[in-house]
Amino acid sequence: MEWQTSAYYWNKHNEKNLPVAATTVQKLIEGYATVRNVNIQNRPQRAIRAAIAARRRTAEKVYVSKPRIKDFGKKVQVTAFLYDAKEAAASARAKQAERFGNKSAPQPKQGQSQVEFLLEEEQTTKLRRIMEQVYKRPVDLKLIKLSKPQLDADILSAVVAQQLKDRRNTPRRVIRDATWRAALPNAQAVSNIIQAKHERQPERFKWNDFTLANTSQTNSSTILDKVALSQVTSVGVEAAGRLTKRLTANRSQRKMARHGATAKEAGPILRGFQKAHVQHGFSRGKRRVGQFGIRVALGHA
């Protein structure tokens, strides 16, 4: 059953579909990651609340994508992607110091990152038990670490929105860096990927292939990996709202940047209104002068 159309009960008085529940689960994972990365030992309650609030406001935190949820009746499968912005920022600072020969620059600490801590079996089990109390059924939880925010539209929109909340950042520079810093294939590489998919011959299976010796070739995961979208080819970021620093004028701005091959080519329509090879992500934020919205579109080949 597709997760877009599945439905379940939070309780017997309140029925919600799974897309609505995905937002709740996303906030649950984000809150769990925030609390686990705050030191609460021998600290007063007021200091703990202040530390958690500061952790939520920082840009170098763990970002969680909107979970992909499937309801199989007896169990629920939840898949979410994680991105560690603190680890990426430390790596970028180390590369910049090495490039300019600054030996006195602080080096990234060698140890466990925020995401690796969450991927431990002990922490995953605790998080899964919390979800099982919500769903009232077994939960199959899968957390996947991403190396770049441009690999998921939800994470990229959240990163851009968090950076725009800081008044020291220029909106145009934030949106430009989110698009042009993405490592994307050129037009020739995209053409080769599409051509290779078109030339791929359909596989025909025999009854002898569905044996224990050939399980690796005929299981559902291997087949889905062959037909799935292989690579991000374009990134588009758009921001609209109160992005200016002026307080006297009730003025709205719109900034947009795009990078990579075009994603306007013909593609199969998903759910009647959306292209299957384009992933969209939306986020919003608030500055001192008002609110703004972020829209991200990732094209795939």
Question: What is each residue range found by the language model?
Answer:
Residues 1-301:
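Ribosome-associated RNA-binding proteins
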